[in-house]
Amino acid sequence: MANIKSAKKRIKVIETKTLRNKMIKSALKTYIKKFEAAFEAKNVEESKTAFATVSKALDMAASKGIIHKNKAARKKSRLALKLNSLNA
């Protein structure tokens, strides 16, 4: 346990940021699952709206440093391939 006042404050800040990051990562997983469900149901319109939501959320998470920008790009690319296969 930290004894220095600034170290104690850093522990509180880290806990807060960790919770926020967990919430955002959990929301990302939920958005991806919604897209996957729409894709499995072969629902084109719902898949398009879900993809837009996922894409925006991934970009925001990458810009805030919660996930790496390459991971966001890879996820978006793979989901876009699925969406395009549904349209074809």
Curated annotation (Swiss-Prot):
Keywords: Ribonucleoprotein, Ribosomal protein, RNA-binding, rRNA-binding
One Pfam family named in its UniProt record: Ribosomal_S20p
InterPro entries with a match to the protein in the record: Ribosomal_bS20, Ribosomal_bS20_sf
GO annotation terms (biological process): translation
Stored SUPFAM superfamilies: Ribosomal protein S20
Cysteines engaged in disulfide bonds, as pairs: none
Gene Ontology cellular component annotations, sorted alphabetically: cytosol; small ribosomal subunit
GO molecular-function terms, A-Z: small ribosomal subunit rRNA binding; structural constituent of ribosome
Keyword Cell membrane in record: no
Signal peptide: none
Organism superkingdom: Bacteria
Function: Binds directly to 16S ribosomal RNA.
Alphabetical list of NCBIfam families matching this protein: S20
Family label: Belongs to the bacterial ribosomal protein bS20 family.
Name of the protein in its database record: Small ribosomal subunit protein bS20
Organism: Clostridium acetobutylicum (strain ATCC 824 / DSM 792 / JCM 1419 / IAM 19013 / LMG 5710 / NBRC 13948 / NRRL B-527 / VKM B-1787 / 2291 / W)
Gene assigned in the entry: rpsT
